[in-house]
From Swiss-Prot:
Source species: Gibberella moniliformis (strain M3125 / FGSC 7600)
Gene designation: FUM3
Record family assignment: Belongs to the PhyH family.
EC number of this enzyme: 1.14.11.-
GO MF annotations, alphabetized: dioxygenase activity; metal ion binding
Subunit structure: Homodimer.
Keyword entries, A-Z: Dioxygenase, Iron, Metal-binding, Oxidoreductase
Pathway the protein takes part in: Mycotoxin biosynthesis
Ligand binding (Fe cation): 146, 148, 222
Known function: Dioxygenase; part of the gene cluster that mediates the biosynthesis of fumonisins B1 (FB1), B2 (FB2), B3 (FB3), and B4 (FB4), which are carcinogenic mycotoxins. The biosynthesis starts with the FUM1-catalyzed carbon chain assembly from one molecule of acetyl-CoA, eight molecules of malonyl-CoA, and two molecules of methionine (in S-adenosyl form).
Record carries keyword Methyltransferase: no
First-level EC class: oxidoreductase
Induction pattern: Expression correlates with fuminisins production.
Protein name as catalogued: Dioxygenase FUM3
Knocked-out gene: effects: Produces only fumonisins B3 and B4.
Amino acid sequence: MNKEKVPQNAVPNGRTKLRQVTSATPLDEVFQYWEEDGAIVIKGLLTSAQVEQLNQEMGPILQKVAIGGHASDVRLQNFHGMKTKRAGDLTNNSAVFRDHLLDNDFIHAVSQRCFAYRGKMGPDAYWLGSASTIHVGPGQKPQTLHRDLGSYPIFWMLGPQGPESQINFLVATTDFTEANGATRIIPGSHKWEFNQHGDRDMTIPAEMKAGDCLLISGKVIHGTGGNKTDQERGCLAVTMCANFLAPEEAHPFIVSMGTAKKLPVRSQRCLGFRSQWPQSSPGLWTKDYSELALHLGLDD
């Protein structure tokens, strides 16, 4: 769509700082704040010891990953960040990710409530879209403002009244500051018509301590800030999407069977090692219309 032809008259909701909760906060309160602003900070989702271990586990991977990624499209290169490291394959390489994020009760509670679509899809109607680092290096320019639901065009067509296609848990593995590229949000923009794009002056930084988590709607306008420091800003992005949508990462082709067999059932399901059973569906991701886990021998 040509942005110049559409009057840009949407305004933020006036929030100057995102509200903060913890994993112990009642879900009704979490969802109230999240639905009002499109983003919320969860304090202390990981402990300092877990963050330290996670950074140690990901260190060797980050040393090898290409800065800026491998996309041949210049537009995607700029979007991903020419001075940003995006490394996946976390399930194979990080015990902290496996034990404390992929199998995190709070993340699952939020995802379960979000993707149940008010009970129409059943309790487990989500799986892992992607999990990757977003390590923003010194000198990285601000990312183009965007909505994450762009990966699923049909949801774009449904507009802001449509259900969520995906949500993102951005876990800080270093402190997030305005100077080092804290993710920037336009509060309330998830309620705008999708032909409204906002601008950087409307954004506020989601400043956090390492271990905190920024939960964002797939509809909210956001983008990584520019890093004006000499230190890297560390982040782990954990995306959940509806389980009738293709995930960004091809987890069953990446995660080893040896690793998968050691995981809890809900982690196996989230990674696509088990079938998906949305309410009223005869089953998705099956073998002979039966549970995939039987074919894979996960229940032996």
